[in-house]
Swiss-Prot record:
UniProt region (Disordered), positions on chain: 155-210, 230-350
ZnF endpoints (Phorbol-ester/DAG-type): 477-527
Function according to Swiss-Prot or TrEMBL: Plays a role in vesicle maturation during exocytosis as a target of the diacylglycerol second messenger pathway. Is involved in neurotransmitter release by acting in synaptic vesicle priming prior to vesicle fusion and participates in the activity-depending refilling of readily releasable vesicle pool (RRP). Essential for synaptic vesicle maturation in a subset of excitatory/glutamatergic but not inhibitory/GABA-mediated synapses. In collaboration with UNC13A, facilitates neuronal dense core vesicles fusion as well as controls the location and efficiency of their synaptic release.
Pfam family, one: C2
Keyword list, A-Z: Calcium, Cell membrane, Coiled coil, Cytoplasm, Exocytosis, Membrane, Metal-binding, Phosphoprotein, Repeat, Synapse, Zinc, Zinc-finger
Expression across tissues: Expressed in kidney cortical epithelial cells and brain.
Residues that bind Ca(2+) 2: 616, 668, 670, 687
Gene: UNC13B
Compartments, as annotated in UniProt: Cytoplasm; Membrane; Cell membrane; Synapse
Name of protein: Protein unc-13 homolog B
Modified residues (Phosphoserine): 16, 176, 295, 367
Bias-annotated ranges (Basic and acidic residues): 184-193, 278-294, 312-339
Biased composition, class Polar residues, residue ranges: 230-242, 254-276
Length: 1591
């Protein structure tokens, strides 16, 4: 769909001027339009028409018709083929065409004309280019149209020539955006006016009614764009609007070969570098590697970047008017051939990147790359190429702001970065180019044709002089007096009868006009002029002369007092002095002539009315209209029951008085009896619905005007408006424009003069106060001019306001203008939207009745809205943060946007216009997108400029790299500058929507979103190679974290979400932790070596541990502090870090403990050193607990917590082991002390009675006995209490207590319980009584071991003393521990056994040893036994009968005769006088002998059977030598007691098993060598299987 613009200018006819009253009709594609009718042989229409064209094979038919009384006749016609019409966005001078008499038809369609006539018509026809299309592109398309037209009927097209020419972006690409998810693709679709919505750009192949020419999507970066960023670019900045449009897919619209560049235009105003995005799209595979990019910021351009230049073979069309001025701003490079080749390295990079199997996707396919990945393609490719050529020379150096430190993976990490500048500097000062912007809407928006229409300007100049030389504001008021009529007289104003007998009304004493008292204020005509007119008509020459002289004097005074007014008028219309003087004379004379020589023909068409009052009971009215001019009155027909009637009735009047008024009144016709009676009594029987009084002097030319209906009196109920088409032919002024057009011409020219000529493009804002300050448009002189003109010719104040608003729209970016425009539009809104109780006309209908033109104003607002949106999309550039004035303009611009939204909602009554807050938010986001793109692409330069760095880097190293991370901190710094500027400068200004828009937060959100995409992909690339040091990654992590926490974390849109940035760095943090573990272990070894060299000195007098512990945990805490300061918000990732760090802690501490444990025995001979080393281990445990709490304590990850708890247990075990080793190191010295104690104890004599003397003596003896031990303990325990940590001290005390107790038991009371050698000697030596002497020798002076009761009492007292000593009044071991100590209990039990009889000990043995028989596990045979237990009922004595039945499966090897027999022994108390042992006969060489022998044991009645047991022993009888034991079994009689008898197979074990109690009893009994029962018992329980022969 294309837009055809036709301007019907003038015509020249042959013939008498009186016979022509012509109009022109235009026909194309079944659409017909008609001009107004104009008289004369050289009529001038100057009317514009627009048509939507979908078929270019048709033509435009132009017919000129002459109006007749009955029918119209055709003067001539002309047919113009649409293919021949030029393409242009500028109006041309037009072409004269000869009118022909006949038309030629073909297939029912006009195809040409014939038979020329002498008449000619001037037409300007053109196809309009898309709004704001770049000038170069306009030339290109115009050239293409001309080229196509030049081909003629053959319609051939040279594809070869086309392929050689540089293609331009498609126009469709500028007017639409195909992304269905775009946040901005429908910004204008729901509120565009009918006019703007019906003219789609001519380059679309299909109609796109919603395609807004000012849409600007968020930029989309593609890999193709980024590959081309290294190619040559020419950029040219110009002044007008531009947008940023990217195209993810190709648009198949261009008539050339497929366009390879999308229109990548800036959201920026012309001068912004912020949005100078190097984004290009390749769409032609043949040209991918050879074409270069030219980006041009062109006037009226939707596209700043990506515009390919023309080749020299394409001559641009002639540029006229505004285009010439702007073309002059273009650099010379624009005119050179832009077809260049990219550098070889770019081609190489592209080839390398694509690889043999890689290629870009099809043009219409979606890109496989994310936005962030695209940034990296070029950087990664370059570095990989360089890595292939240049060997890696080590890790890159840290950025200057990163301190290099020891322990590579640990130090040099800045965990608390603050990237904000100490002195904020607006980044826009660095990002903006020199501003050369021409403020205002593009020429297509605010075309002011009145500036070029000299004929109209000349007429307006005269009318302005006429209005100002004798202004209405200075007219002479009437001199009214109360007057009595003697004859029936009618009011001059309302034509009503002056009722009454006397004093009926008012009469002016000067001019004689009569009216009602209520009507005198409605008579505002000048009294002098009225008097002059009347005198002239009645021949009162003298009186007339006097009046004329008075008027002359007044005009002279006016000219003398206000010369500046007429000078301004002369300057505005550029009239030379001589002509001005002559014109002043002419104007004065016309004023003096008044209406005496004035006449006009007036044609009034009553078209329709809207919103009338309902007067009938039915809620409706039956309106008709009366029109009165002078004394002539006419009326329309009645429209019944309609409040929005349409009459379409035309009336003709002749008027000879310029001061006359046209009185248009609307009535409600009543046809009932009441109205008929009223007709008889009153002139006005019908109900009054409203009136409008039109001054004839305010009429000019053809007017189509809506007039608001007004009241006659305060009692009138009036509403609505009436539409009148008025045609006025004033004698001598037949061809002038309507006064509204004339006022527009005056206002626009005055505005142009004051701003562009006097103000050099700046708008002077008048100072005005009060409620009507918005009606003051200029300074005093200029304001008086427009006000007087408006007053004279009836221009409504709202029309003045809308006209001034339209003028300001072309300068809306000048300082102070947005505020004025906002106020103006707010008052315009109030005028239309704020209805009163007296009117029921909707705001939309009132606006539709505007004389300014509904479509015109709506289109103006639509275009202004788009332009404002564009400028807000580059607010950082257009409204610098460093300029308070521009910031105020920014605030006013948003207010203006809000007013436009209010207008659309309340005045246009659109259903859902875009909310101003959302529009501003979208604009802010668009600006931030382009800002980020720019700082990303120019990061090094901007950073160097902002921080005055002199570092020069080659272009390929300025961007992101996989060999270093220098780029990213710089980018973060720039991002922070942007966010800070938005937060501190723009947020306080853009505060109109506090609930919906916070610029600082939006800035942080957008910047973080874009940065996150790039950062994520960058780190994915780094993961592949890990070319940077882990400390560098950690530093970057901290900066990213700081950026997130400072600006992003609290954003509402991210509340409740787990940030994703920790996941980007997880692998690098784990890598750092791996390296840190190695560093920590190395550090540990070094710390221990240093500590060892220093002799493990205490760190201070109060600290009981050495430096190595402090060093180790200082290093671990530093490492953990880095992890902690990461403040990882992702619990799962933090858990990974904690698990890994827990492993490091475990390795380090366990290696420390292992090293100490290994060397510890060597240090035990020194006094303090072992204690310090144990203190070190204990301090490890203390610090580990603190670190556990620091890492989260109960909140710590379960796996990490378990690891640390397990480590704590291990360290506890280590400390126990070291304490044991340390305690055992005192064994030799304690042995010596205890030996001395034993000697002293052996000298104690006396009985163990309980007399006081005996107790005192025992206490003294105990002190004497303890002296050797106490001397030793005093010296050492005092040292330990000083040197050891409390926990270590207790462990050392426990070990010493253990050693002392065991040694006393072993050396004083019994052989040591754990001395298996001694036990074995007991077993072996007791095998036969003849060897007891060996046992005695081993136990050293057995007589001393057989402690007397006195000695036991002394020893018991000594134990109490030792216990109190180790308790140390609560500073040592706890009493509970000491009392329950198994060592003490064992010793005391042994002592208690010393005083018991042999029978008691044996009974205790039998009752306590329940598991003596262990042959079940490894039996060496079995014996069948039958036991019967009898208890005498009288005496209670027990008799046991034992029958040895047989033996079986005896395991024995012997070289000689094997003669097994069974020995049965009764073990128990009170057996000294009874037979205790029986033996069976031996059986020769029988391993399963049968005995069947019965034995009887008699037990006393002192004890029950549970105190006795049978011990069965199978032996091999040997003659002349000791019998050898095969196996033993024990049968407690307690098992037989319940049943009374038992028969079983008893397995034979190798020896008797007993616990410590049994061994103790055995040892005590072994010392009673004179007791036969004891000696026999020891021998019996000490027996074990003899060694077999041959084994």
């Amino acid at each position: 769909m294309s837009l055809l613009c036709v301007r019907v200018k003038r015509a020249k006819f042959q013939g008498s001027p009186d016979k022509f009253n012509t109009y022109v009709t235009l026909k194309v594609q079944n659409v017909k339009s008609t001009t107004v009718a104009v008289r004369g042989d050289q009529p001038s229409w100057e009317q514009d028409f627009m048509f939507e064209i979908s078929r270019l094979d048709l033509g435009l038919s132009v017919e000129v018709w002459n109006k007749g009384l009955i029918w119209d006749t055709m003067v001539g016609t002309v047919w113009i083929a649409l293919k021949t019409i030029r393409q242009s966005d500028e109006e041309g001078p037009g072409e004269w065409s000869t009118l022909e008499a006949e038309t030629l038809m073909k297939d029912d369609e006009i195809c040409g004309t014939r038979n020329p006539t002498p008449h000619k018509i001037l037409l300007d026809t053109r196809f309009e280019l898309p709004f704001d299309i770049p000038e170069e592109e306009a030339r290109y398309w115009t050239y293409k149209w001309e080229q196509i037209n030049a081909l003629g009927a053959d319609n051939e097209y040279s594809s070869q020539e086309e392929s050689q020419r540089k293609p331009l972006p498609t126009a469709a690409a500028q007017c639409s955006f195909e992304d269905p998810d775009s946040a901005v693709d429908d910004r204008d679709s729901d509120y565009r006016s009918e006019t703007s919505n019906s003219f789609p750009p001519p380059y679309h192949t299909a109609s796109q009614p919603n395609a807004s020419v000012h849409q600007f999507p968020v930029p989309v970066r593609s890999p193709q764009q980024l590959l081309l960023q290294g190619s040559s670019r020419d950029s040219c900045n110009d002044s007008m609007q531009s947008y940023d449009l990217d195209y993810p897919e190709r648009r198949a619209i261009s008539p050339t070969s497929s366009s390879r560049y999308g229109s990548s235009c800036n959201v920026s105003q012309g001068s912004s570098q912020l949005s100078e995005l190097d984004q290009y799209h390749e769409q032609d595979d043949d040209h991918r590697e050879t074409d270069s990019i030219h980006s041009c910021h062109s006037s009226h351009s939707l596209s700043r970047d990506g515009q390919a230049g023309f080749g020299e073979q394409e001559k641009p069309l002639e540029v006229t008017g505004q285009a010439e001025k702007e073309a002059a701003c273009e650099p010379k490079e624009m005119k050179e051939d832009a077809t260049t080749h990219p550098p070889p390295d770019l081609v190489l990079q592209k080839d390398h990147f694509l690889g043999p199997q890689e290629s870009f996707p099809e043009e219409n396919a979606s890109s496989p790359f994310t936005q962030a990945r695209a940034h990296w393609i070029r950087a990664v490719t370059k570095v990989r190429l360089q890595l292939q050529e240049i060997p890696d020379d080590g890790d890159p150096s840290l950025p200057q702001w990163l301190p290099e430190g020891p322990a590579g993976g640990l130090y040099g990490i800045d965990s608390m970065p603050d990237l904000r500048r100490k002195k904020p500097l607006p980044l826009v000062s660095d990002l903006s180019l020199v501003q050369s912007r021409k403020a205002g809407i593009t020429s297509a928006m605010a075309t002011r044709t009145s500036l070029k229409d000299e004929e109209l300007k000349s007429h307006v100049y005269k009318k302005t002089l006429q209005a100002l030389i004798y202004p209405i504001s200075c007219t002479t008021p009437h001199n009214f007096e109360v007057w009595t009529a003697t004859t029936p007289t009618y009011c001059y104003e309302c034509e009503g009868l002056l009722w009454g007998i006397a004093r009926q009304g008012m009469r002016c004493s000067e001019c004689g006009v009569k009216c009602h008292e209520k009507c005198q204020d409605l008579l505002n005509a000048d009294c002098l002029q009225r008097a002059a007119e009347k005198s002239c008509k009645h021949g009162a020459e003298d009186r007339t002369q006097n009046i004329i002289m008075a008027m002359k004097d007044r005009m002279k005074i006016r000219e003398r007092n206000k010369p500046e007014i007429f000078e301004v008028i002369r300057d505005v219309f550029t009239v030379n002095k001589a002509a001005h003087v002559q014109q002043m004379k002419t104007v004065k004379q016309s004023v003096l002539d008044g209406t005496s020589k004035w006449s006009a023909k007036i044609t009034i068409t009553v078209v329709c009315a809207q919103g009338l009052q309902a007067k009938d009971k039915t809620g409706s009215s039956d309106p008709y209209v009366t029109v009165q001019v002078s004394k002539t009155k006419k009326r329309t027909k009645t429209i019944f029951g309609n409040l929005n009637p349409v009459w379409e009735e035309k009336f003709h009047f002749e008027c000879h008085n310029s001061s006359d008024r046209i009185k248009v009144r609307v009535w409600d016709e009543d046809d009932d009896i009441k109205s008929r009676v009223k007709q008889r009594l009153k002139r006005e029987s019908d109900d009054f619905l409203g009136q409008t009084i039109i001054e004839v002097r305010t009429l000019s030319g053809e007017m189509d005007v809506w007039y608001n209906l007004e009241k006659r009196t305060d009692k009138s109920a009036v509403s609505g408006a009436i539409r009148l088409q008025i045609s006025v032919e004033i004698k001598g002024e037949e061809k002038v424009a309507p006064y509204h057009v004339q006022y527009t011409c005056l206002h626009e020219n005055l505005f142009h003069y004051l701003t562009d000529i006097q103000g050099s493009g700046g708008v002077r804002i008048p100072e005005a106060r009060g409620d009507d300050a918005w009606k003051v448009y200029f300074d005093e002189t200029a304001q008086e001019i427009v006000d007087e003109f408006a007053m004279r010719y009836g221009i409504e104040s709202i029309y003045q306001a809308m006209t001034h608003f339209a003028c300001l729209s072309s300068k809306y970016m000048c300082p102070g203008v947005p505020a004025v425009m906002s106020t103006l539009l707010a008052n315009i809104n109030a005028y239309y939207a704020h209805t009163t109780a007296s009117t029921n006309v909707s705001a939309s209908d009132r606006f539709a009745a505007s004389n300014f033109g509904k479509e015109r104003f709506v289109k103006l607002l639509d275009q202004l809205h788009n332009s404002l949106r564009i400028d807000l999309s580059t607010y950082r550039n257009n409204f610098p943060a460093g300029s308070p004035e521009r910031l105020q303009d920014l605030k006013s611009t948003v207010d203006l946007l809000t007013s436009i939204t209010f207008f659309r909602m309340k005045v246009q009554e659109l259903q859902s216009p875009p909310r101003a807050s959302q529009v501003v938010k979208d604009c802010v986001k668009a600006c931030l997108n382009s800002t980020y793109e720019y700082i990303f692409n120019n990061c090094h330069d901007l950073y160097s400029r902002q921080y005055q760095l002199k570092q020069e880097l080659p272009p390929e190293e300025q961007g992101p790299s996989i060999r270093n991370l220098d780029f990213w901190p710089k980018l973060i710094t720039l991002i922070v500058s942007i966010i800070e500027e938005d937060k501190n400068s723009y947020t306080p200004v853009l505060n109109q929507f506090p609930q919906e828009l916070n610029v600082g937060k939006v800035s942080a959100e957008v910047m973080w979103h874009l940065f996150a995409q790039d950062m994520k992909y960058a780190l994915e690339e780094h993961e592949k190679d890990h070319l940077c040091k882990s400390a560098d990654y950690m530093n970057l992590h901290f900066k990213v974290k700081w950026l997130h926490n400072e600006y992003v974390r609290d954003l509402p849109v991210l509340q409740g979400q787990v940030p994703e940035y920790p996941a980007w760095f997880e692998q690098f943090v784990l890598q750092w932790l791996d390296e840190n573990e190695d560093v920590s272990l190395e550090f540990l070894r070094g710390a221990l070596e240093r500590d060892k060299k220093d002799g493990f000195q205490q760190t201070s007098e109060h600290a009981l541990f050495s430096c190595s512990v402090v060093d180790v945990f200082t290093q671990l805490n530093q490492s953990f502090e880095i992890i902690r300061k990461l403040e990882c918000p992702d619990p799962s990732i933090l858990a990974h870090y904690m698990r890994r760090f827990a492993k490091t802690i475990g390795k380090v501490l366990m290696q420390y403990a292992d090293i100490l444990s290994k060397d510890f025995p060597a240090y035990c001979t020194k006094e303090k050193l072992p204690c310090i080393l144990m203190n070190n281990v204990q301090q490890l445990r203390v610090q580990l607990e603190k670190m556990f709490e620091a890492m989260g304590g109960k909140e710590l990850d379960l796996e990490a917590a378990d690891s640390l708890k397990e480590l704590q247990v291990k360290l506890n075990t280590v400390l126990d082991e070291l304490s044991m080793v340390f305690g055992n190191s005192f064994q030799v010295r304690i042995d010596e002390c205890v030996r001395q104690m034993a000697d002293i104890l052996g000298q104690v004599r006396g009985t163990g009675n309980a007399s006081p003397d005996a107790r005192a003596s025992a206490a003294q003896d105990a002190d004497s006995v303890l002296r050797p031990l106490m001397d030793f303990l005093d010296g050492n325990l005092t040292l330990f209490a000083t040197v050891c940590e409390k926990t270590v001290l207790k462990r050392v005390l426990k070990e010493l207590w253990r050693v002392v107790m065991n040694t006393m038991e072993r050396m004083i009371v019994l052989p040591p319980l754990t001395d298996q050698t001694g036990t074995q000697l007991i077993f072996t030596a007791a095998k036969e009584l003849s060897h007891l002497s060996k046992l005695k020798d081993h136990m050293v002076r057995e007589e001393t071991r057989n402690l007397t009761p006195k000695q036991c009492a002394v020893l018991d007292l000594a134990l109490d003393t030792i216990k109190q000593y180790f308790h140390a009044g609560g500073n040592g071991l706890k009493k509970t521990f000491l009392e329950k100590s198994p060592d003490l209990q064992s010793l005391r039990y042994a002592l208690s056994l010393y005083t018991q009889t042999t029978d008691t000990l044996i009974k205790t043995f039998v009752r306590s040893q329940t598991t003596q028989g262990s042959g079940v596990d490894d039996p060496v045979g079995e014996v069948s036994i039958q036991v019967d237990l009898f208890t005498h009922p009288g005496t209670g004595e027990h008799k046991v009968t034992v029958k040895v039945v047989a033996a079986n499966d005896l395991k024995w090897q012997t070289a000689g005769m094997f003669r097994p027999f069974v020995e049965v022994t009764m073990v128990g108390p009170h057996q000294s006088d009874k037979k205790r042992k029986f033996t069976t006969k031996s059986k020769s060489n029988n391993w399963a002998p049968k005995y069947n022998e019965t034995f009887h044991f008699l037990l006393g009645n002192e004890e029950g059977p549970e105190s006795y047991e049978l011990q069965i022993c199978v032996k091999d009888y040997c003659f002349a030598r000791e019998d050898r034991v095969l196996g033993l079994a024990v049968m407690p009689l307690r098992d037989v007691t319940a049943k009374g008898s038992c028969a079983c197979w008893c397995p034979l074990g190798r020896k008797i098993h007993m616990d410590e109690t049994g061994l103790t009893i055995l040892r005590i009994l072994s010392q009673r060598s004179n007791d036969e029962v004891a000696r026999e018992f020891v021998k019996l329980k000490s027996e074990s299987r003899s060694t077999e022969e041959g084994s």
